[in-house]
Structures are given as C-alpha cells and as structure tokens.
Curated annotation (Swiss-Prot):
NCBIfam families: PRK04914.1. Belongs to the SNF2/RAD54 helicase family. RapA subfamily. InterPro entries: Helicase_ATP-bd, Helicase_C-like, Helicase_RapA, P-loop_NTPase, RapA_C, SNF2-like_sf, SNF2/RAD54-like_C, SNF2_N. Keywords: Activator, ATP-binding, DNA-binding, Helicase, Hydrolase, Nucleotide-binding, Transcription, Transcription regulation. Residues 489-643 form the Helicase C-terminal domain. Interacts with the RNAP. Has a higher affinity for the core RNAP than for the holoenzyme. Its ATPase activity is stimulated by binding to RNAP. ATP binds at D176, E177, V178, G179, L180, G181, K182, T183. GO terms for biological process: regulation of DNA-templated transcription. The keyword Metal-binding does not apply. The keyword Nucleotide-binding applies. A motif (DEAH box) lies at residues 283-286. This is RNA polymerase-associated protein RapA.
C-alpha cells in the first residue's frame, strides 16, 4: 500500500469510525485519525485493514461545510486526490482537496462498497441472502408468536392464542379450569401482539403474591423482560432534579404490579390511568367483587383502566365457579355497551338452553328431533340449513354426516352469544389428564407436641389455626428445639424418599421456616440431596433451586417448598407430592396439587398427606377427601361449599368432640354431588368446542411440531454464529454454550449476555431444564441475529470465482438482490402481505436474467472464494461493465417487483375483505361483534391498499462472479 499524509481511507473492520485521514507514517507503521469518532489508530504497514477512498466521475460527495456536489473530474497530485465538483445547491464548479471531504461517511449502497473495495467474503453474501429469505418467511408464517414459547404444544392453548392474538385490540375472558394454562394462553396472545407490533405498552395487574410468578413466567417462557413496579420504585420519580414530577408508568413499556397496591395508592392508580397502555392483563379477575349497587374499589379501578386501554385480557375462574352475576360483571368490564344490564343478560342466557340441547344431540350423533331442528333453524335463520339437516337424519354414510354436523357446529360457534369474548376449557372437555391417587398416612402425635399444646392451652397462648402446625407450637416454648428429631412425619418422609430413589418428590409446607428446617433434617439424617424454595429467596435463588430439582443426574431428589413460594411454579416432571401441611381452603389445595397436575403431566400423581391421629389436620383431610373428593378430582365447587360450610367445619376442627362430624361429611358429599350434577348439566358444549379448537387446533400443534423437528433453524443459526464470531461450545445432550468474543464482526450481539448463555433447539429439553434458553425463529437471539445481518452491511458486496470448463475464462456474471418493501405504521402489520422480500437477479454480460435457469444453491455449489487482492483487481478492471449491468438490472427488476406488489395487494384485499364480510354477517346474529372492530378493519384495508400501492424496491446486495477453468 502507498500511503501519503492527507489521504482519505476507511477502516475495513470498523466502518463506524467514519472517513479517516493519514496523519503519520514510518518504516513499519501508519497512523490514521478518524475525526468523526475522535479516534486514532496505528496499523502495521504490511497489514493495515484500510481501503483507499477515491471517488469517480458522477459520484456524489459531501464537503466538511455540509454542502453536496457531483464529481466532474479527478486529478492525482503527489498521491493526493483533487476533485473538480459541481455544487448541487448553486451549480458552481469548484476544486476540492480530499482533505476537505466530510468526515462522516459510510458506504451502505452495495455498489459503493464494491467500488471502494469494501468486499465481503463470499460466505457473508450467502448468509445475508439466507437471512433475507428467512426474514420473509417468518414475517408471513402463521406460526409466528405461537412456536417460540417454552411450553408444550397443547392444541387448545394454541387455538385460543391464535384466535385472539390475530385480532385488533382483543378484549376477552380466559376462563379455563385450573391447570389448563391460562397464563400461557395470555403470554402467547401477548407475544403475537408484540411481534405483530399491534401493541407496545403492556400493564399486567396481579395479586401481590403472584407478581414474581408472572415476572418469571414472562421471562422464562416468552423472553419478555417486564419491570416490577411497587411504591419503592415509583417513589424515585416523586422528587426529580428538575422539580417536574414524572409519571413512573411511562418509564417502561412492559410493567407488572399488584392490583391491591394501586387500590391503596390512588396517586399511582391515577398515573397508571395516564400511562397510555395498549394492552391490559388482569389475573385472578374473579376476585374483583361486584354488585349492581356497590362494586368494589378494585373493580372500579379495572373498569376505568379498561375504558382507556384498547386491548384487555381477563384471566378468571370458570363461569360455573363465579356464578352468573359475577360472570356478567367480568363481561361488563370487556364491553359495557353490550353487557349493560344483568337482567337482560340473564334473559339472553336462558335463550341458549334449547341450543345447548341441540348441540348435545349433534355431538352425540343422535337423530335430531323436530324441536331441535327448529331451534337450530331459528338460530341460523340467515342461512338455509335444511340440506344439512336432511343429511344428518338420512341414511347417508358416516363421513357425509360428520361433514354436515361439522358445518352446523362451525356456524353455531361463530354465532354463539359470548363465543368471541369468552374462552373456557374444562378438564372433561380437554381430557388426557392422569389420575390422582390419595395416600393418607396416619401417625401418632408425639408426647412432646401434646405436652406443649396442653401447657399453652392452659396459659391461653394458643390460637385455633396454630393447632394445624404442632411443630410451631412446640417451638413457642423453646425456640432452639429441633422438633424434626422426634417428629414421626420426618422419619416417614425419609423412608418414602429412600423407597423412591429414582423419583422426584415435591414437599409443600405452610411456611418457609418449616421448609428450611426439613431440608436440614434430610441432609443431616440421611444426606439426601434436596433444595428449598420459598418466598424469602430471590428470583435467581429460586431459579437455581428449580434447576437443581429438575436435573436428572446429580440433581436434588426432593424440593421443599413453602405454599407461597411454590405459587406459579410447575414441576410436571415429578409425580409425587407430599403435603406436609394442608392448606386451609379447597382452592389453595388445588393450587398445591396443580404444581404437578397440569397439562403435560404424563403419569398418575401420588398425593401423600401425613397427619396426626385425632387432630384438626386429619379431620380437615377427611373433609377434603370424603366430603369434596378434592384430592383425587378437581373440585370446581370447592370454594362455594367451603363458603357455605366453613363456619361449621371450623367448629369441628377446633372442638375436642367429633360427634356428628361423619354426618357433616356426608352432608357435604351430597351437596358436592348435587353441585357437580348441576355443573355437568349446565356445561356449555358449544363454548367448549369454540374454546378447544377441535381438529384445526390439533393440526396447528402438528405444524409446530414439524417445524421443531426441522434442522433448518439449527443450520442457519450455527452458521450465523460462526460468521459473526460467536464462540460455541457443544455440551452434548442437545445443548451448546454461546458466548460473545472480542473478534466478532459486530461490537454487540443484542440478547447475548457477556458471560454467555446455554441454549437448546429441543423443546422437550427446554421444558425439563429452565436454565437453558430455547432457540426458535421467534427467540430474540435469532431475530436479533437476522436483524444484525439484514440491517447492517455484512455481505452487501462480494466477489467469487466460478469454476466451469464450459465457459470462457473471465466470463462476467452479476448476481443482484433487490428488496421489495412497503413503509407503513407498525400496527397495520403489512408484513403479513408484503414483508421485505428479496428478489434475485443473475445477469450475464448482455444483461440477460439467468436466475430462473440457475438457482442460488445450484450456483453456490460451483463457486470458490477469491482473494482480496485479486478481487480488487477484478473490480477495477471490470468496473465499467459492472456499472452497466447495475443500470440494466434497474430495468429488469421492474416487472417482477410490480408483480410481487400486485400479489400482496390482492392478498391484503382478499384477507381483510373476507374478515370484514364475515363480521358483517355475524353482527346480524351476534351482538358481540363490536361496530368499532369492523370500522377499524375497513380503515385498515383502505390504508393498507394505499400503502402497498406505494411500495418500492432497492438494491440490497450484489456479487460479482468471474469464471475460470479450474
């Protein structure tokens, strides 16, 4: 290289430094200053990663004073360039030394980079093209936002997520039974809305005890980084340095906070209302008490928020558990105009009873009675269903009957009263759950406990609830006493653990202290590997404990958890549950069992309850088991019966006499059977069908499973890491560690931690080991990796050697990749119809396009890399021909680009018009179709077609190919 002071060069490895000036040179080194970034670099003369910047006639330059000009002529004097230029602002011709050029410069156009000899490796060009193709495919994939979460492929969850996630400003009630995954459904809906850029700002309101659960779930399952808001965090905004009070709720886009906290802090509630959120999620919404005369403060606050936030998801208990009045209150939050009166709602619900019977007949495949046919015809009055009814009641073959029943069912689902607002799945409707097997262990109460109870009773220092926890009563008398040395429950637990050496066991205690002391007992007595898990631990500590418990080899056999600490954590890989303490109400009991009894559990669940004879513990266990059957079945009526029988139950639990207790249990059991029967009769089978998605939902799960099994993502991602310079260490067991390095092509890889991260592409492994990142096309690391390539300069210009004995040596081909794209507001989601679409051309020296005859992969197999020095010479020699071919490509691209844009317009028009027409048809029979939803869609269609009509194309990258015989 020939250097001279004053010459302008750019760094090949650090493009962001700008245009440099040679400031010094000796026998071994060259010094270059980069004024734009205020940096100085010293390079070895022989290997300086620099490229000389020399503009040519017709190029546009920028002067340091800011004006632009077109190069008319170029002169070299003493190795320095002088340009005769014509200013663009006043047409004046003026001579400019290269030292006067603006310091801020970047060669982002592929032809500029090529002619300034900023040539990328051939493999970089290939990666860029593949990244563009994958980006296009992912934008248009119907699985986007559904496949990327760390969860099993559960059809009903995927169906609800897809159905709700694709709506504009969805407002729905998610009311699945416990254990069916409402949180996952909400997360998938949220993820779809975020990826589609329909929403940006999200507020999640939860009970205080569930804040960390949601924080962990959103991060671990969906890679969403929420912020936890409380008074301490918000107080920092109250005394700003500039004395202008700021709203803390606008500081973050994704926020979780406790609803009770907002209720108790009116100032914060007001700030949340002014936060301009796009989506509101409320967990445990059934706790919002309401009556026509006196709604609770919490209910009114959520009502105010739902009035100013367009999209609302309410997670709640099933309507059967809530009762009709409470169920109406949730629907009123979603659409107060539609659900304006409870009496009107009651009357409307009664109208669906005959329909429910007809649905039952359709499901049971009986012949439809005349009455049932009339009711169906009345409900579907806008269409002629007579042909379908005839097929169902005829001697037609089974397949024809199924098609007719399916079409009727589909029409009923679309027109069902609350079908668009309410989704509710039951275990009976979903099925596939394992059995729950109850083991009661009856033990003698140690004399140490009995003596402590007697003494404290005499002193009047014992409260009734404390009788459930004799070890705590014992420690009241002697805080340092080690109760676990004589408590028979501990020896029984140790024996159980030793007898189940290959099994994982979850033990739930009432409090953190007992869990910690039990861990000490297991460790000191038998050296059993165990972990503790409670609310006093940080999220990171709980994550470690959970990961330790999940490890199959060298992991903890036992996890000892407090009841609060275990909330929201699921351990489906275990099937043995020990309830060291019994919760004091059926809903909490179901939550405890629900840690194991969830979607994804493949084995029967063994539930162990060690109790002391003749104590409140064993009587409560008896009432749960014989009265409610709450251990071996889910008990949706448990809360109702507990409220009705709670006072009487407390009397029996705290009384020394057990007279009539058995009779009381029998009465409870009869009421339980009656309520169960009423719930079964009241099952809304049509709603269940709408909620579980049927065959389509199963197909959706299958499609994602097929994509999970493809190696395309793995091949692309590992190649991406290789080229960017991310270090990879294969750990075996389908996992690798990826870490940033100092030699990466980019200064930072968004989403990749400095200390590295362990990842897997295997869904089952990711479910079993929470510490692994689950890489999918939706994962931030993959999406950010694609963005790094397509939004940067990597692979924009390349030169390759084509080994082909049939072609004359030196034959020139030019491969060009254009991008067809539309500029539009995020919320329109035009990428569904026209994502940034790569259009490849392959021109010969005459300008003929050979791309249809020679595929990208077919050509790539024949190419070899070309050295930098040789490539630079080729570009210099062939520049005129290359420039001519680039001009020719601008003509070649017009027709195919216009065709792609026209196809996108047709797709947008068909898709949006079909949805608008469907909603208009439904609106006539289903009041849940909001007028504003149709208006939004119509506006969206008009604007979408206008913007697609303005779509354009640009040259993204190019590759010069020169043939050789060998």
């Amino acid at each position: 290289m020939l250097f001279a002071i004053g010459q302008r060069w750019i760094s090949e490895s650090e493009n962001s430094l700008g245009l440099g000036i040679i400031t010094g040179q000796d026998n071994r080194t060259v010094t270059i200053s980069f004024p734009a970034s205020d940096e100085i670099r010293i390079y070895a003369l022989a290997s300086a990663p620099l490229t000389r910047v020399l503009f040519q006639k017709g190029d546009e330059i920028t002067h340091q004073l800011g004006w632009k000009a077109k190069v008319v002529d170029v002169m070299i004097r003493n190795e320095l360039a002088f340009y005769l230029v014509q200013r663009l602002d006043n047409n004046e011709e003026i001579a400019v030394q290269e030292m006067e050029l603006a310091h801020q410069i970047s060669f982002s156009k592929p032809q500029d980079r090529l002619f300034s000899t900023q040539i990328d490796r051939n493999e970089h060009f290939v990666l860029r093209y593949k990244a563009l193709k994958h980006q296009q495919e992912q934008f248009q994939s119907s699985l986007r936002g559904l496949r990327g979460n760390r969860a099993g492929l559960i059809p009903h969850q995927l169906h609800i997520a897809q159905e709700v996630g694709r709506r504009i400003a969805p407002r729905v009630l998610l009311a699945d039974e416990v254990g069916l995954g409402k949180t996952i459904e909400a997360g998938m809906i949220l993820q779809q809305q975020l990826l589609a850029e329909k929403v940006q700002r999200v507020l999640i309101l939860v009970p205080e005890t569930l804040q960390h659960q949601w924080l962990v779930e959103m991060l671990r399952r969906f890679n969403l980084h929420f912020s936890l808001f409380d008074e301490e965090r918000c107080a920092d905004f109250d005394n700003p340095e500039d004395h202008v009070e700021a709203n803390p709720f606008v500081a973050e886009n994704l926020i979780i906070c406790a609803l009770d906290w907002l209720v108790q802090q009116p100032k914060r509630a007001k700030q949340a209302l002014a936060g301009e959120f796009d989506l509101l999620i409320v967990d445990e919404a059934h706790h919002l008490t309401w009556s026509e005369d006196s709604p609770s403060i919490a209910y009114e606050l959520v009502m105010q928020l739902s009035a100013v936030i367009p999209a609302v998801l309410l997670l709640t208990a099933t309507p059967e558990q809530l009762g009709q009045q409470s169920h109406f209150a949730r629907l009123h939050l979603l659409d107060p105009n539609r659900f304006y009166s409870y009496r009107a709602f009651e009357k409307e619900q009664q109208q669906y009873q005959p329909v429910a019977k007809a649905v039952q007949s359709l499901l049971s495949e009986h012949i439809l009675t005349v009455e049932e046919q009339n009711h169906l015809a009345e409900l579907l009055s806008e269409q002629d269903i007579e042909p379908m009814l005839k097929v169902i009641n005829s001697q037609a073959d089974t397949e024809q009957k199924q098609v007719a029943r399916g079409e009727l069912m589909s029409n009923l689902i679309d027109r069902h009263g609350t079908g668009r607002l309410l989704f509710r799945n039951t275990r009976q409707g979903v099925q596939g759950f394992p059995h729950r097997i109850y083991h009661q262990i009856k033990l003698d109460l140690p004399t140490q406990y009995q003596n402590a109870i007697n003494v404290l009773k005499m002193l009047g220092e014992i409260k009734d609830p404390e009788l459930f926890y004799p070890e705590q009563i014992f420690q009241k008398m002697n805080a340092d006493a080690t109760w676990w040395r004589f408590d028979p429950r501990v020896d029984w637990l140790i024996h159980l653990v030793k007898s189940l050496r290959e099994e994982k066991i979850l033990v739930i205690c009432q409090d953190a202290i007992t869990a910690t002391q039990l861990e000490q007992a297991l460790r000191e007595k038998e050296g059993i590997r165990s972990a503790v898990f409670h609310e006093n631990m940080s999220i990171i500590e709980r994550d470690r404990a959970s990961a330790y418990f999940a490890q199959q080899e060298e992991g903890a056999q036992v996890l000892l958890s407090s009841s609060i600490g275990s909330e929201g954590r699921n351990f489906q890989f275990a099937c043995h549950l020990v309830l060291f303490h019994l919760p004091n109400n059926p809903d909490l009991l179901e939550q405890c069992i629900g840690r194991l009894d969830r979607i994804g559990q493949r084995r029967d669940i063994q539930i162990y309850v060690p109790c002391f004879a003749d104590t409140p513990q064993i009587r409560l266990a008896q009432w749960y088991h014989e009265g409610l059957n709450a251990f071996e079945e889910t008990c949706p009526m448990g809360a109702i019966l507990h409220e009705k029988c709670g006072a009487k139950l407390t009397e029996f639990l705290t009384s020394d006499t057990t007279d009539d207790f058995q009779s009381f249990i029998q009465q409870t059991h009869q009421q339980q059977l009656q309520l169960k029967s009423e719930l079964e009769q009241g099952r809304d089978r049509l709603l269940e069908l709408n909620s579980n998605g049927g065959i389509q939902a199963q197909q959706l799960a299958n499609d994602i499973a097929i994509q999970d099994g493809s190696t395309e993502l793995i091949d692309f991602t590992l190649n991406l890491f290789d080229i960017i310079g991310v270090e990879q260490e294969d750990l075996g067991e389908k996992s690798i560690v990826i870490s940033p390095t100092g030699t990466m092509l980019v200064p930072d890889f968004p989403g990749l931690k400095e200390e590295g991260v362990t990842v897997t592409f295997d869904r089952d492994l990711a479910l079993a080991r929470e510490e692994l990142e689950f890489l999918t096309w939706d994962h931030p690391i993959v999406r950010n990796g694609i963005d790094l390539i397509v939004s940067g300069d990597i692979g924009k210009s390349a030169v390759a050697l084509l080994v082909n004995k049939q072609l004359p040596t030196g034959t020139l081909l030019l491969e060009l990749v254009y991008i067809i794209e539309s500029q539009s507001p995020r919320g329109l989601q035009l990428t569904r119809f026209l994502p940034p679409t790569p259009l490849r051309l392959l021109l010969d020296i005459k300008g003929n396009d050979l791309s249809h005859q020679i595929s990208f992969q077919g050509l790539q197999k024949q190419l070899k890399p070309m050295g930098k020095n040789m490539a630079t010479k080729v570009i210099k020699i062939m520049r005129p021909a290359i420039e001519q071919l680039i001009k020719q490509s601008e003509k070649n691209v017009v027709e195919p680009a216009k065709m792609i844009i026209e196809q996108a317009k047709q797709l947008a028009d068909q898709s949006l018009s079909a949805e608008i027409n469907r909603l208009y048809a439904l609106q006539a029979v289903n009041k849940n179709i909001r007028p504003e939803e149709i208006e939004q869609l119509e506006s969206q269609r008009t604007l979408s077609l206008e913007l697609l009509n303005q779509a354009n194309w640009r040259l993204d990258s190019l590759r010069v190919i020169v043939s050789n015989k060998e």
